[in-house]
């Protein structure tokens, strides 16, 4: 009774779940338009992705709302591959902005994020730097709404990460990138964000596994410590 598939010499594997993706095929989710969303999603669907979380970099509220409106509409379609919207920012540490747009970066503001969350239920993940003023309140609020709180673009040390984990931050965005490792100030040594996340056994991590953002030796270390499930 098993289904036979003629793979013509190729492999049949489960479809990929893209949890952090800014676009593809010339389409950028930051544009917020249905055309951009479809262009990017179709490009990924042609190469083995079957589910996707469109990702926005640090954005203004109108940009978030436009993308959320498009995302909500497309999620309602039959067999939609979109699982939810991922916001990478804009509550990030300016010193670790990296490729983010600095003009959009700020501290968490409940007068801003509460209406966004209440109005747009398509948002399923929101990244933030936990050391920012208001970040713990933000983490508790969004996790209470079923949104994954993730650590990103941060200078957090151990106590920041420990407190953040207790506040609901259970994931780390592009682990090792835009976050410090072990370091010192004068003669004193401090755990960086990386080591602190390793010490939170149940925290999950995502890695840009291209051998460039994170070298192969470090990829092996992440796998050895966190394992395939985390």
Predicted segments, located by residue:
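Histidine-rich, glycine-flanked metal-binding segment
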Residues: 1-13
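Di-metal (Zn2+ and/or Mg2+/Mn2+) metal-binding site signature of metallo-dependent hydrolases
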Residues: 10-32
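Divalent metal-dependent hydrolysis catalytic cores, especially in the metallo-beta-lactamase
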Residues: 22, 38-67, 80-93, 120-131, ...
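Active-site loop-to-helix "anion-binding N-cap" substructures in soluble metabolic enzymes
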Residues: 27-31, 43, 57-63, 131, ...
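Charged helix-capping and loop-helix junction motifs
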Residues: 33-36, 67-70, 109-111, 186-193
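Surface-exposed amphipathic alpha-helices with a cationic face
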Residues: 72-75, 139-146, 223
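Divalent metal-binding pocket/active-site signature
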Residues: 87, 94-110, 115-191
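Active-site-adjacent C-terminal substructures of enzyme catalytic domains
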Residues: 160-230
